[in-house]
């Protein structure tokens, strides 16, 4: 039993760790792309729009890989932690379902518009698409963190006669003090990751005297976001 539990933990830990590499960068790049689109809209300088298009391609690829690596993690709730899922499913399934039904579809729908609809949407419509992708990605992070925070610090629940859990206050689950702290920590880490990735690529381009104009934008936006 102890060996099986250890294997389950290692298995799940590897899956979660590998998966989180991708949504962390996705959530970090989303607000930076909005910043680039905002600067392009206000200044009418093509360099900002071109920079946003460049990072949007990376965002799109990273988003797809993040979705694919997240599917095995969901399956492992049943394969590795079946009894836990059975007992607590009435609680943790709520934020996880909202992540899929609301924020994931919001992000996915507007990402499609953002990737392929620039010419049809116009500049302001394209900016709104970028902003909604940002909102969707950060909402996804919030619902996932809320589910994790409840596992660490259970609130707003009752135990039923069969031993399972039920929610007594959905807002109590979402406003869990641990969830708010974890969410702030997670989003700061994601933003720093995205900022450093952008600044690092810009620095690499500058060192190689390649696309200097874009490289300066990458470094400036990345460093400012990372420091702030």
State where each predicted segment sits.
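Polytopic transmembrane helical bundles with strong interfacial aromatic enrichment
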Residues: 1-228
């Amino acid at each position: 039993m102890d060996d099986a539990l250890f294997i389950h933990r290692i298995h799940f830990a590897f899956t979660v760790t590998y998966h989180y590499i991708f949504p962390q960068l996705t959530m970090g790049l989303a607000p930076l792309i909005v910043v680039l689109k905002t600067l392009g809209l206000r200044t009418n300088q093509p360099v900002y729009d071109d920079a946003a298009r460049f990072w949007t391609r990376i965002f799109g690829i990273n988003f797809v890989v993040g979705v694919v690596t997240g599917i095995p993690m969901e399956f492992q709730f049943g394969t590795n932690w079946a009894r836990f899922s059975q007992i607590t499913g009435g609680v943790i399934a709520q934020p996880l379902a909202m992540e899929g039904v609301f924020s994931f579809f919001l992000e996915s729908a507007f990402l499609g518009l953002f990737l392929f609809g620039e010419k049809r949407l116009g500049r302001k419509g394209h900016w709104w698409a970028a902003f909604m992708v940002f909102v969707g990605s950060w909402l996804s992070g919030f619902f996932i963190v809320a589910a994790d925070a409840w596992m660490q610090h259970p609130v707003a629940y009752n135990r039923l006669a069969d031993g399972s859990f039920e929610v007594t206050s959905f807002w109590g689950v979402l406003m869990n003090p641990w969830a708010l702290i974890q969410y702030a920590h997670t989003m700061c880490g994601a933003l720093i990751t995205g900022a450093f990735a952008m600044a690092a690529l810009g620095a690499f381009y500058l060192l190689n005297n390649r696309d200097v104009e874009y490289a300066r934008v990458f470094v400036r936006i990345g460093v400012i976001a990372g420091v702030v």
